[in-house]
């Protein structure tokens, strides 16, 4: 079956033309999982099935079972078609903006009686949008200010009587009174001017109201208007000035390094940089320019972004290609302050990539240092591959074990394994560990799989001795075995190693100790999760049902006393005894609850 689809793809590739167009990759269920475009379709499609790829492309190619292509007359047409196909199919491998970053906008709804709202959803034809705002607080504060000045309706549904907002002057009461549409139009114009940076009209309006209130000796109302004027001044001076004009514009910049591309977008509103967006893209088959054209098309067509008056992009890009997918004025500044903004966006993209690689390098450096330190302290070779085991059961019910693998100090989830205990009756941790280690390394030997440089067991000398006995006397293996002991707070406390399970001296703030902590937490999490899944499958309804000495009467009494399993977990042995449990049963219950 595998060779059938490969042969089919090979045959189809031989007839693909050397023309521009789009291609659709499909999986075994005939679902479109990737859409791309190319100047020469055959060359691009062949590249997927030859040579080495990064991890993401390798996963994609592994799922491809068929493909289709559509020939176009130009690269521009290919770009437009690609965006439409992505919108249509939403393929999971090439939605650049699938994290769906959304920003808050202020919206005046398109209704007979408009509302002023804050929203993260942009729907064309439903109203007038202003923004984006850097965060919800900023948008809400601005709306709150406008609500005090412009009495748009507040109710989602029109009530049959006047509400509180009418009585405090923040609504004109359209539920009862007729409101002239010209009044709404005038308010909308003034709000638009204000939110687009022209605050003179609204300030003059408020100053006139303040003077009028003062003349009428209504000093409390005059103070309110004075505070509103001050609030507007505070609101408009918070952002860094990036431009001397109030044109709404988005500024794009990008940088490419080590197979990654970062695209930065500056949102300039009222001459201010009010928000920044950064997107990291792994470069695959397309050039950096092609990736940019696809990105910017998706940015405005798929994501929650409104088109500004101008979009500024670097000079090296094809303006016509961008114009074909972005329906607004495209500017490529050559000099002056506007070019400096594009350069700044480019520089921010460069810095973001440098930071990304620096963090990766530091992480790799830390993990390598951790395993080197661990090897030195234990007196063994650097443990490149570590396999760790942990058991999980409740009083011997549904016993399971789990193994996690760490390579170069990092979790390798492909190496994780789960085991149901088959040969052990009752809660016997030592025998369970022996069984699992025997099964694991018998298979490793039979299948020629890589052996670990270090085995870690969650436990002490008894667990270590049992594992060593299986490895050395049954399987003939010489692999270092260490134990991890926990303190009374169930936290990693000590590393044990050697014939007498002696404590390995490790500083608690060392990278090696931090690595051991992560390994123990991860294997415990993996084992507990598997045990819970197993219990659910076997129909085990309550941890109380697993504890010897707790029947239906005691179970009812416990639930009546504590109200929930959560409260029982927080209870001490003394508390459990007060609920009528003998000390031994209380101890067993506490142990069972801590494992649940």
Swiss-Prot record:
Assigned protein family: Belongs to the UvrC family.
SUPFAM superfamilies: C-terminal UvrC-binding domain of UvrB, GIY-YIG endonuclease, RuvA domain 2-like
Name of the protein in its database record: UvrABC system protein C
Subunit details: Interacts with UvrB in an incision complex.
Localization (cell): Cytoplasm
Alphabetized NCBIfam families for the sequence: uvrC
DNA repair recorded as keyword: yes
Organism expressing this protein natively: Staphylococcus haemolyticus (strain JCSC1435)
Primary site of residence: cytoplasm
Keyword terms of this UniProt record: Cytoplasm, DNA damage, DNA excision, DNA repair, Excision nuclease, SOS response
Gene Ontology MF annotations: DNA binding; excinuclease ABC activity
Domain GIY-YIG: 18-95
Segments forming domain UVR: 200-235
């Amino acid at each position: 079956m595998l060779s059938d689809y490969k042969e089919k793809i090979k045959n189809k590739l031989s007839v693909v033309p050397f023309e521009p167009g789009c291609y659709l990759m499909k999986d075994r269920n005939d679902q479109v999982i990737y859409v791309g475009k190319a100047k020469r379709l055959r060359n691009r499609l062949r590249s997927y099935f030859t040579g080495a790829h990064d991890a993401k492309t390798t996963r994609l190619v592994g799922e491809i079972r068929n493909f289709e292509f559509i020939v176009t007359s130009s690269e521009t047409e290919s770009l437009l078609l690609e965006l439409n196909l992505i919108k249509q199919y939403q393929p999971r491998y090439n939605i650049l903006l699938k994290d769906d970053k959304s920003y808050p906008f202020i919206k005046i709804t398109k209704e007979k009686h408009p509302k002023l709202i804050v929203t993260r959803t942009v729907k064309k034809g439903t109203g007038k949008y202003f923004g984006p705002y850097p965060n919800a607080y900023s948008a809400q504060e601005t709306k709150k200010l406008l609500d005090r000045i412009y009495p748009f309706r507040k109710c989602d549904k029109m009530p049959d009587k006047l509400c509180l907002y009418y009585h405090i002057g923040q609504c004109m009461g359209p539920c009862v009174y007729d409101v002239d549409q010209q009044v709404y139009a005038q308010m909308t114009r003034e709000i638009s001017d204000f939110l687009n940076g022209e605050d003179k009209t609204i300030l003059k309006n408020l100053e006139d109201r303040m003077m009028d209130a003062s003349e009428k000796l209504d000093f409390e109302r005059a103070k309110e208007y004075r505070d509103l004027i001050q609030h507007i001044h505070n609101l408009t001076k918070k952002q860094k000035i990036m431009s001397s004009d109030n044109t709404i514009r988005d500024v794009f910049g990008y940088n490419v390094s080590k197979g990654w591309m970062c695209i930065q977008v500056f949102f300039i509103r009222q001459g201010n940089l009010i928000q920044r967006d950064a997107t990291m893209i792994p470069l695959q088959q397309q050039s950096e320019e092609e990736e940019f054209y696809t990105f910017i098309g998706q940015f405005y067509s798929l994501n929650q972004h409104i088109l500004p008056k101008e979009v500024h992009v670097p000079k090296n890009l094809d303006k016509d290609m961008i114009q074909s997918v972005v329906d607004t004025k495209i500017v490529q500044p050559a000099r002056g302050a506007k070019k400096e903004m594009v350069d700044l966006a480019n520089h921010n993209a460069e810095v973001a990539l440098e930071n990304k690689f620096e963090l990766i390098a530091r992480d790799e450096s830390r993990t390598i240092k951790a395993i080197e330190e661990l090897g030195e302290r234990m007196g063994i070779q650097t443990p490149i591959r570590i396999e760790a085991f942990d058991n999980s059961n409740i009083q011997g019910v549904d016993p399971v074990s789990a193994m996690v693998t760490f390579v170069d100090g990092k979790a390798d989830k492909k190496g994780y394994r789960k085991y149901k205990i088959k040969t052990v009756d009752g809660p016997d941790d030592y025998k369970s560990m022996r069984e699992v280690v025997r099964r694991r390394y018998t298979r490793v030997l039979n299948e020629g799989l890589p052996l670990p440089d270090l085995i870690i067991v969650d436990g002490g000398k008894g667990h270590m001795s049992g594992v060593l006995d299986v490895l050395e006397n049954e399987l003939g293996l010489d692999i270092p075995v260490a134990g991890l002991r926990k303190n009374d707070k169930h936290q990693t406390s000590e590393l044990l190693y050697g014939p007498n399970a002696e404590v390995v001296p490790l500083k608690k703030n060392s990278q090696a100790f931090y690595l051991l902590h992560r390994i123990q937490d991860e294997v415990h999490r993996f084992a507990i999760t598997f045990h819970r899944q197993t219990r659910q499958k076997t129909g085990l309804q309550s941890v109380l049902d697993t504890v010897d000495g707790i029947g239906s009467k005691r179970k009812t009494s416990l639930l009546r006393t504590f109200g929930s399993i959560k409260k029982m977990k927080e209870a001490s042995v003394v508390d459990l005894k007060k609920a009528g449990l003998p000390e031994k049963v209380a101890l067993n219950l506490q142990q069972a609850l801590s494992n649940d």
